[in-house]
């Protein structure tokens, strides 16, 4: 049957392929597994991801009560280091994110405002953007499943995010008496890190991803950051 725009209208049989109510059947949906943590301003040698599910660990969400447990803003893991039965996940790509912060209070993250004022007659460096450069410019990622590693890669900017907030503007002045306002932002760029072949995580299979640095890398800004990992792929689960 032709539609108003000349396309073909799916039949009821075709529509059934996308039904969410199919008793006894499985379904596959596009989804990410994600986990965020606080990056302390003093730096750290290793961070382990996907080990603290919702309700455990420490949140790194902007504005959250310091030291409170993780919520869905931090992770969508419901078990520690594994998927519940009967779920499975096909990992297609890996992304690593770093968000600069604006507080050094323990167990607290506060978002960084990229707009800054340059005082008259001075030149300043955007230390928060150097945070990302310092942290992601070294170190390595290790994807460990079962009893062995399936991926080791360095440096960490090898895993750019597919999405992000871009702030692109500049302002210059030659005035000796007027302050200037500028904005600056930075993020990893390049092709996404696709796994070839893809990797399947079956129900109750233990796994973790660690970010590792040979020495603790402090943030030049003196503030805590927020660092996260996304596994992009297909989630397999029972239909309803």
Feature roles, as predicted:
Residues 1-240:
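Beta-strand-centric surfaces of beta-sandwich/beta-rich domains
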């Amino acid at each position: 049957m032709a539609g108003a725009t000349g396309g073909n209208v799916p039949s009821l049989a075709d529509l059934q392929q996308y039904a969410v109510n199919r008793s006894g059947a499985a379904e596959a949906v596009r989804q990410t597994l994600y986990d965020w943590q606080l990056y302390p301003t003093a730096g750290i040698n290793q961070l382990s991801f996907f080990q603290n599910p919702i309700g455990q660990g420490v949140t790194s969400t902007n504005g959250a009560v310091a030291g409170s447990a993780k919520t869905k803003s931090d992770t969508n893991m419901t078990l520690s280091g594994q998927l519940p039965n009967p779920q499975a996940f096909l990992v297609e790509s890996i992304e690593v994110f770093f968000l600069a912060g604006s507080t050094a209070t323990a167990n607290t993250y506060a978002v960084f405002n990229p707009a800054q004022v340059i005082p008259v007659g001075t030149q300043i460096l955007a230390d928060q953007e150097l945070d990302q450069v310092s942290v992601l410019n070294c170190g390595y990622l290790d994807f460990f499943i079962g009893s062995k590693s399936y991926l080791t890669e360095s440096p960490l900017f090898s895993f750019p995010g597919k999405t992000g907030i871009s702030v692109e503007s500049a302002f210059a002045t030659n005035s000796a008496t007027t302050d200037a306002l500028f904005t600056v932002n930075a993020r990893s760029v390049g092709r996404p890190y696709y796994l070839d072949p893809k990797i399947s995580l079956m129900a109750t299979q233990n796994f973790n991803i660690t970010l590792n640095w040979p020495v603790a890398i402090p943030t030049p800004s003196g503030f805590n950051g927020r660092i996260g990992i996304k596994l992009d792929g297909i989630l397999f689960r029972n239909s309803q």
